[in-house]
């Protein structure tokens, strides 16, 4: 086999990216008014990477998160997971098996304990724990992100904002998703708690191989991610490697409106 043939063969058998957005645009219609919030977005999201999305209000960040999370479909273009268009895969299946979104409002079941919230997520999605019972798996997950058994068995209404955020993360992880998305996850948290949440996101990407995508206005949070995506006027205008020295990064990544 020649080197050219080998290269072609390797390219043909290469695994598709985890998630690809191809020429994605999204338009909202209200009466006679149509507003396009995303315009021709092309990007690939990979496993083991922590992404942040910065941009002014109205730039399309939350819309992008909704499309990546399978909560909506683009007006034009395609969103594909592991080489399959999400509409072909099925949005409900994608959300149940592959992607989970943590919203600004955690949407926890407030009449349940932290532990019950996590086990309920597994029951709803039909997730099977890798070992032991769902309860045991939920306790392990909660412990892995800093919530001990005593905290796990408390009603979520009695937990702090940071603890509730951790429960929301554990609930998403309980279904062993490939992609974890979060919308302004540290906006209402104190600095120490916020940094603890960022530590969890980094661990999920770097130690567990998850793809983590976080919409934020925080430049400090973005500086700890692997890749910073900047949306302006509906276009993905910058892709910044945060491992580069700050002085080498393009301008416009402060995250201010």
Where are these regions (language model features)?
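Helix-to-loop junction immediately C-terminal to a conserved catalytic motif
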Residues: 69
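Conserved ABC transporter NBD signature motif
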Residues: 77-85
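Conserved ABC ATPase signature
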Residues: 155-159, 163-165
């Amino acid at each position: 086999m020649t080197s050219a043939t080998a290269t072609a063969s390797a390219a043909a058998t290469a695994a598709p990216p985890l998630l690809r957005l191809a020429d994605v645009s999204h338009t909202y219609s209200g009466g006679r008014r149509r507003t396009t919030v995303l315009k021709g977005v092309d990007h690939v999201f990979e496993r083991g990477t922590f992404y942040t999305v910065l941009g002014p209000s109205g730039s399309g960040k939350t819309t992008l998160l909704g499309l990546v999370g399978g909560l909506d479909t683009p007006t034009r273009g395609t969103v594909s997971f592991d080489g399959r268009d999400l509409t072909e895969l099925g949005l409900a299946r994608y959300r149940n098996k592959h992607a989970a979104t943590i919203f600004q409002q955690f949407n926890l079941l407030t009449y349940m304990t932290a532990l019950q919230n996590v086990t309920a997520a597994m029951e709803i999605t039909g997730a099977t724990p890798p070992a032991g019972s769902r309860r045991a798996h939920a306790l392990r997950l909660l412990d892995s992100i800093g919530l001990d058994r005593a905290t796990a068995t408390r009603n979520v209404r009695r937990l702090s904002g940071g603890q509730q955020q951790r429960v929301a993360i554990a609930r998403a992880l309980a279904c062993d998703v490939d992609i974890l998305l979060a919308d302004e996850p540290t906006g209402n948290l104190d600095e120490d708690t916020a940094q603890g949440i960022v530590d969890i996101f980094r661990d999920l990407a770097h130690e567990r191989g998850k793809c983590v995508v976080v919409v934020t206005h925080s430049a400090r949070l973005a500086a700890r991610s692997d890749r910073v995506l900047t949306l302006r006027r509906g276009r993905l205008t910058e892709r910044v490697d945060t491992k580069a020295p700050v002085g080498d990064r393009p301008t416009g990544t402060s995250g201010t409106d």
